[in-house]
């Protein structure tokens, strides 16, 4: 067994929880949303039929059920959280007559197999690993040439609104040793915020545990960082949100170049500021400006890991927030209003000052698909 720290597995296993459970009142609608997601990242979900699938971290299994409904040839799951493994077992029983199913109850870093797969799917597990790039490289190793890897990215910019909410939890002492009571306090405090979150599909208390209380000992990883890590192993196919437009003719000889990911990286970085707020979208801007924005926002994320909040940390946060305000494009009016309100609240502790902030959510987690080369 690996001696490395496993951020998700340690926290979930310690408390015996699965805070990723999705509330799915309408299965048909949920499956349609999943189909549209796959199409957005360049994959018709019908292509799963007859394929060999590896899923890492299936969690409570709602998304797994969608995959299995597409009739793959085989499905292999790697799940290291005992509570999740128990939940996924019950789901897999309903499909074992039509699909070859294999469940490995281990940490992914301890998983070994000579098999290669048509699809490797790792949703919500790459960001916050101790070394996300290393995790990606192990994932791509299980993809056969021409096969697809589907994963997520979260960077400092997309995470900023939630990093600030994590900081509020610590400043206001909403977290203590009682996990359930802490989650209820946080869910109550941010209830109005969550009511503004499009597509919210899990319990507010589960969100509180997974996003606010979870210590997040690992690192963020952006789309650009992930594509750089995979440069020699995989080629970008698609993403959600979609940001890359390629006007080349299909016979253009540049398609034969080895650095196919570089134009995508440049495009992403020039538009990265749009991840900060799901209510606003503006034109491309300087890569230098966005690198600075991501650097400062990532520092805010690091502050959100601190357990005990004090005046010195608040002063540092104020410096970061003012730098972000200065960095924002003039079109980012709603983001500016929200961040100004947050900064005012730090000074006044008057809940009314958070009014504009409560509507602010970033494009937190992005989906990415790449082709193994």
Place the predicted regions along the sequence by residue.
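Conserved alpha-helix/loop element of class I SAM-dependent methyltransferases that forms part
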Residues: 28-49
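Conserved SAM-binding loop of SAM-dependent methyltransferases across substrates and taxa
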Residues: 60-71
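Conserved SAM/SAH-binding beta-strand->alpha-helix loop
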Residues: 81
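A short acidic, Gly/Pro-enriched loop at the edge of an enzyme's catalytic core
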Residues: 112-120
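A short SAM/SAH-binding and catalytic strip from SAM-dependent methyltransferases
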Residues: 119-131
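A short glycine-rich, Lys/Arg-flanked "PGG" loop and its adjoining helix->strand segment in the class I
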Residues: 134-145
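Conserved class I S-adenosyl-L-methionine
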Residues: 150-186
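Substrate-binding/catalytic lobe of Class I Rossmann-like enzymes that use SAM or dcSAM, i.e.
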Residues: 178-307
């Amino acid at each position: 067994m690996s001696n490395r720290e496993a951020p998700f597995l340690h926290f979930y296993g310690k408390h015996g929880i699965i805070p990723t459970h999705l509330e799915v009142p309408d299965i048909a609608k949920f499956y349609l949303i999943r189909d549209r997601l796959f199409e957005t990242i360049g994959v018709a979900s019908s292509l799963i039929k007859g394929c060999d699938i590896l899923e890492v971290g299936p969690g409570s299994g709602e998304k797994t059920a969608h995959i299995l409904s597409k009739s793959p040839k085989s499905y292999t799951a790697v799940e290291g959280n005992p509570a999740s493994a128990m939940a996924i077992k019950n789901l897999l029983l309903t499909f074992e007559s039509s699909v070859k199913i294999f469940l490995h109850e281990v940490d992914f870093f301890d998983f070994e197999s000579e098999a290669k797969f048509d699809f490797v799917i790792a949703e919500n597990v790459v960001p916050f690993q101790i070394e996300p790039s290393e995790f990606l490289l192990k994932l791509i190793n299980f993809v056969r040439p021409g096969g697809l890897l589907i994963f997520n990215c979260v960077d400092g910019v997309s995470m900023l609104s939630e990093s600030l909410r994590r900081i509020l939890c610590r400043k206001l002492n909403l977290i203590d040793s009682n996990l359930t009571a802490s989650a209820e306090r946080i869910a109550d405090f941010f209830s109005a915020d969550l009511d503004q979150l499009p597509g919210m599909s899990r319990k507010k208390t589960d969100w509180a545990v997974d996003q606010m209380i979870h210590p997040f000992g690992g690192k963020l990883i952006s789309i650009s960082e992930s594509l750089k890590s995979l440069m020699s192993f995989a080629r970008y196919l698609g993403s959600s949100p979609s940001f890359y437009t390629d006007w080349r003719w299909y016979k253009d000889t540049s398609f034969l170049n080895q650095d196919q990911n570089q134009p995508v990286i440049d495009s992403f970085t020039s538009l990265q500021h749009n991840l900060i707020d799901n209510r606003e979208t503006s034109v491309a801007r300087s890569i230098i400006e966005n690198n600075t924005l991501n650097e400062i926002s990532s520092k805010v994320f690091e502050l959100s890991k601190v357990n005990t909040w004090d005046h010195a940390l608040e002063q540092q946060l104020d410096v970061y927030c003012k730098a972000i305000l200065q960095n924002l494009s003039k079109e980012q009016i709603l983001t500016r209003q929200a961040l100004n309100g947050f900064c005012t609240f730090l000074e006044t502790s008057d809940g009314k000052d958070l009014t504009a902030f409560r509507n602010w959510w970033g494009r937190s987690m992005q989906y990415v698909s790449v082709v193994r080369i």
